Amino acid sequence: MNTSKASKKRKAVTRDVEEEAGVFSGDELNTGNLDGALSDNAHDLSSDEDESDSEVELIDDFSDEEDEEEEDVLDSDEIPSDGEDSAKKKSNAAPGELGAVIDDDDDDDDESPSEEEQLNYRIEKDANGNDRFVYDEINPDDNSDYSDVDENANTIGNIPLSFYDQYPHIGYDINGKKIMRPAKGEALDALLDSIEIPKGWTGLTDPSTGKPLELSQEELELLRKVQMNEIPEDGYNPYEPIVEWFTSQQEIMPLSAAPEPKRRFVPSKHEAKRVMKIVKAIREGRILPFKPPTEEDEEDDTIVKYDLWADEAERKDHPMHIPAPKLPPPGYEESYHPPPEYLPSRKERKTWEEADPEDRDREFLPNDFGSLRRVPGYENFVKEKFERCLDLYLAPRVRRSKLNIDPESLLPKLPSPEELKPFPTACATVFRGHKGRVRTLAVDPSGLWLASGGDDGTVRVWELLTGRQLWSVKLSEEDPVNVVRWRPGKDALILAAAAGDDIFLAVPPIVDPAMEKASLDILDAGWGYAASVPPPTPAEANKKNNPPKWMRPSSSLADSGVCAVIPLRYVAKSLSWHRRGDYFVTVCPGSSTPASVAIAIHTLSKHLTQYPFRRRIKGGGPPQAAHFHPSKPILFVANQRSIRAYDLSRQLLVKILQPGARWISSFDIHPTSSTASGGDNLIVGSYDRRLLWHDLELSQRPYKTLRYHRKAIRAVKFHPGGRYPLFADASDDGSLQIFHGSVTGDMLSNATIVPLKVLKGHKITGELGVLDVDWHPREPWCVSAGADGTCRLWM
């Protein structure tokens, strides 16, 4: 190069770059000028640099080897032709080599463009001969705002690669050239990659480029820190000293111990003034709580109002149209704060949860939320609305004609209890003297005396009205007196009592001598008949079920008034007299009692005992009680679950009653049965708290079942004689219940049963209450025996 060109501005820059095509600003390189700049005029550059404020800057010393490498790298295609404009000349240095920009100043320096005004594109001809602008790749330097060009980066944008599945390319670069799809390795390459895993290998594919996704060194370091439970951020200290912006110590004493000012307890005067102003304005009408809309607001043309039903013509309902039934209104159990009695217990909740959804009585359980803001969303809301919709359009509808019947007219016309008086209402006399429970009692046919027996083994006779004890006898030291009954009839006064395995017949010395002598004559008449009976043969004597022989009592019992003893060998719990007073029946309900001797009929005039049943009564367990019919030769025998009627004259089974009770405790026959007043009626008490009324002509099932007691019913009794249509029952809940039960002779009408009164006075002792009850023969009075050791007269 000539020395005259030493005054030209030259700039040489050397730096280490990656093996990429560099992009430099400035004039295009000329081959001749480049050779001269690198070889001949090296000293000129340094001299010019020192002498003047030239823009040529030499950063590094260049060797001849670098010049030769740079010349070799230059390609012929990168050298512009002579026809191109010198202002647009541009060449790219080889990657990794020297990048130099030399501004050649011609003689006319003003005509050369500045470095900022130089163009970053070149013009080429496309296939149609039109001009086409080609932009060079940007290769930023250290001072540039651009980042390094990533040759693996995809410039197609945020477009899914699935759009290019059917094409060999995956997008286009900035110049519109296709970016070809990267080649995929075969099975052998995949095997080699799995054996020699490069650093940063993930086994994933980058969705934007289609190439294997590799992690950088920074990302690997971040993953290592996370795996080792280290802090990912550099320079972060998790153990910095605590700065207590607020104290962690609980302060007990106040910050200020000054007394509270009075203004905090006195209403504010300023607020009172403001409130009074508002009140005055409301009274004067200057402030209205509701301001009605004016006519201008109502006639506002900008507001368009639509009437959806303006063109809808009124249509009559179909003749067969049936409106949908309304849902029942919600009850107390659906409240968010229901009363406590509507909330289920734990047992009820568990039973409801364990039951099948179809077997549940309701779809939800009542809950108490306390306040409305705590009520959550109803989980079955959508289900209920869906089922309601199904019912509306799937369930058939039927018109049901309502019967205009007064419900009161359907109920039986029962008289008022006030109209059915007299009946016992209060306790008049209390009989005290027994030690332990009083198990049984009976009122004599005259209505003057009361006999009772209890656990102390004694039988006591009381004066009914005064409660004074007149006579007492000790029948047993160990066994209680289970039952006492007076012989019917007023011609004699004979008392039968069952204690232990024996039956005792006594004449209490409480009457006049004539009555006492008549009673003793009736008892003594049987001894002569018993002596005239021939003794049993040896074969009959060896039988186990031979009837017992009547015996005379011991001297001590005879002095007390006992006249005869019947050894039954089993405990009798029931004793009932025939209406004529010559027969009485006993029942031994023990499980160890043989069936053939459980029921015995005794003849008073002959001192004879007979066993009418050879076998156990079928069905229902052992017998519990037995009574004679008041007017017919019929014996009623009750076992645990049924009652059988036997005709003694014909020795036939007449009828079987099925009360439906689990265990019958007692029963009684109406005193006017089989007379002009009506048919056979009887009442049954059971240990399962039921009181049953049976009409034998109506059915073998009970006519009425009354459940008014909370515990077992021990005894039931009709008023004797039929003068008063009353009957009573005694229960272990400590109460007696008085009923009105009238029977008419009209076969088309049924018996009328009306509850009258509940009598309470006995104390419950040992889970036992009232054990026996009996009526006065002429008055509407009743007497009860309790487990508390007392007897009570109710009138």
UniProtKB/Swiss-Prot annotation:
Tell me which Pfam families the record gives.
Answer: BOP1NT, WD40
Instruction: Write down the superkingdom of origin.
Output: Eukaryota
Q: Where is the composition biased (Basic and acidic residues)?
A: 122-133, 344-365
Q: Where found in the cell? A: Nucleus, Nucleolus; Nucleus, Nucleoplasm
The record's GO CC annotations read: nucleoplasm; PeBoW complex; preribosome, large subunit precursor
From the UniProt record, which GO molecular function terms apply? large ribosomal subunit rRNA binding; ribonucleoprotein complex binding
WD repeat ranges per the UniProt record? 433-472, 476-516, 618-656, 659-704, 708-749, 765-795
Kindly indicate whether the keyword Repeat belongs to this entry.
Answer: yes
Where's it mainly located? nucleus
Where does this protein have compositionally biased stretches of type Basic residues? 1-12
Parts forming coiled coils: none
Pro residues composition-biased segments: 325-342
Q: Has UniProt tagged this entry with the keyword Nucleus?
A: yes
Q: Region (Disordered): which ranges?
A: 1-133, 319-365
* GO-annotated biological processes: maturation of 5.8S rRNA from tricistronic rRNA transcript (SSU-rRNA, 5.8S rRNA, LSU-rRNA); maturation of LSU-rRNA from tricistronic rRNA transcript (SSU-rRNA, 5.8S rRNA, LSU-rRNA)
Return the Acidic residues bias intervals. 47-84, 102-118
Q: Which UniProt keywords apply?
A: Nucleus, Repeat, Ribosome biogenesis, rRNA processing, WD repeat
**Which PANTHER family does this entry report, sorted A to Z?**
RIBOSOME BIOGENESIS PROTEIN BOP1 (PTHR17605:SF0), RIBOSOME BIOGENESIS PROTEIN BOP1 BLOCK OF PROLIFERATION 1 PROTEIN (PTHR17605)
What is the stated purpose of this protein?
Component of the NOP7 complex, which is required for maturation of the 25S and 5.8S ribosomal RNAs and formation of the 60S ribosome.
Q: Which family does it belong to?
A: Belongs to the WD repeat BOP1/ERB1 family.
Quaternary structure annotation from Swiss-Prot or TrEMBL: Component of the NOP7 complex, composed of erb1, nop7 and ytm1. The complex is held together by erb1, which interacts with nop7 via its N-terminal domain and with ytm1 via a high-affinity interaction between the seven-bladed beta-propeller domains of the 2 proteins. The NOP7 complex associates with the 66S pre-ribosome.
Q: What is this protein called?
A: Ribosome biogenesis protein erb1
Q: Which organism is it from?
A: Aspergillus fumigatus (strain ATCC MYA-4609 / CBS 101355 / FGSC A1100 / Af293) (Neosartorya fumigata)
What lineage, starting at the top, does this entry show? Answer: Eukaryota, Fungi, Dikarya, Ascomycota, Pezizomycotina
Primary gene name: erb1
